[in-house]
Amino acid sequence: MDASSADPTCDRRVAAARAAFDEGRTRDHLWRSRQLAGLIRLIDAHEEDIVKALGRDLGKPRAEALTAEAWLVRAEARETSRSFRRWARPRSVRTPLSLFPGASRIVPEPRGVALIMGAWNYPFLLTLSPLIGALGAGCAAVVKPSEQAPATADLLAELLPRYLDPEAVQVVQGDADGAARLLEQRFDLILYTGGARVGRLVMAAAARHLTPVILELGGKSPALVHDSADIAEAARRIAWGKSLNAGQTCTAPDYVLAPRGRMDAFLEAYGAALARFHGDDAAASPDYGRILNRRHFDRLSAYLGDGRVVIGGRTDPANLFIEPTVLVEAPGDAPVMQEEIFGPILPLIPYDSWDEALAFVRARDKPLAAYAFGRDRDAIDRVERDISAGAFCGNDVILQQTVPDLPFGGVGASGMGAYHGRAGFDAFSHAKAVLRRPVRFDSGLRFPPHPEGKLRRLRSFF
């Protein structure tokens, strides 16, 4: 389909956002501040609506909906509101003597109209967190919530025009075909969160207009447990990260590498942690979510046959429930070890040396995050230094995403670009190079003719 056949609704919404940006209103610092304040008011006024929508879409527990979505967005909006003026200040840089008198600086300017394509697993957080970066940078935005989380998408479509500038921030809903039509439009930046297959389609569509992209994808994030680790605490934190949102977190630990001699201790501690979190029946726990839909449920259920189930394994298709599960003896070529799991199933793999564990991870695609547990600082330092990943967290999981000043992004197959906090402002800004020189003074050395004496003088500047 070429651009001439695109959905006219998409045309109108993108054109409205473009007109608002071209008018110049989004560059104004007061406008930016008001939009960020509007997001905070939206959350404060509709906290329960957000919780209900996330519950309908994902069976997300109330505590998760608040602490891992709504309140994180609120905190980031508040931090950006406090800081964007400082981030937006021009930065002076050294000007060579050959250009004296002159002044050089780097000026952040908004990229323009951004397309933000949200994800279904955290449909509130992963749609509005990048929007915060866009608003702080002074961009207009077209927001495309995930159609796979329809209750949250409907809520965003209802509330964003009420609390934000309804011309500069447009919400477009639709399925995959609608998203494809939207991608035919010209944007100044596209940010997509989701899987690698669609990420490639987004990048190909962006290439038609030479539009820069930020791709937040995923991958198989490893958790390496060193022999020096507190096994009980490592298991507890990994169990929390793997159970959060029923494992449907892009930075959740995908598999665990543990010393062969401590496998049983890890399994015992992991099972005990799950029992403390959710009791004897996770299906009855108010703090455990559900799988998004039947397609993902069936995909995850198939993984249960890729190894031997030693913890969990129960499923209920009628309620889209999969119990927190640990697999052992999963072959390296099994789908559960080749594909991002994105669910509460955890392969546990033994190793005989730390070198072997690191080599296992390095032989695979670069993950969105890497985790290491241990008291041996040198061993943990090696993982941070030698494993290329979007992020690293020592002795915990996932929490690096909650640090306001840390960027969130992948590397290699796990994505490109980053946002969150200052990184979000920078992502939606262009660093414009500026040189100002006086009208009257000029040495004339650069102008022809260039006899040898003049060249010798010029050489002294290089």
Set out the residue ranges of the language-model regions.
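Conserved C-terminal structural/oligomerization subdomain of aldehyde/semialdehyde dehydrogenase
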Residues: D2, R27-D28, L224, I322-F462
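Structural signal for hydrophobic packing residues in well-ordered secondary-structure cores
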Residues: F21, R25, I40-I43, E47, ...
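Residues at or immediately preceding the N-termini of alpha-helices
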Residues: C10, H29, E47, I231, ...
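Rossmann-like NAD(P) dinucleotide-binding subdomain of oxidoreductase/dehydrogenase enzymes
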Residues: P96-E233
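Short glycine-enriched loop/turn motifs at secondary-structure junctions
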Residues: L183-E184, L217-G219, T249-T251, A284-S285, ...
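N-terminal Rossmann-like NAD(P)+-binding subdomain of aldehyde/semialdehyde dehydrogenases
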Residues: M1-R105
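Residue-level signal for inorganic ion chemistry
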Residues: R32, A77, G138, V169, ...
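ALDH superfamily catalytic-core signature
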Residues: L164, R197-P331, G394, K454-R456, ...
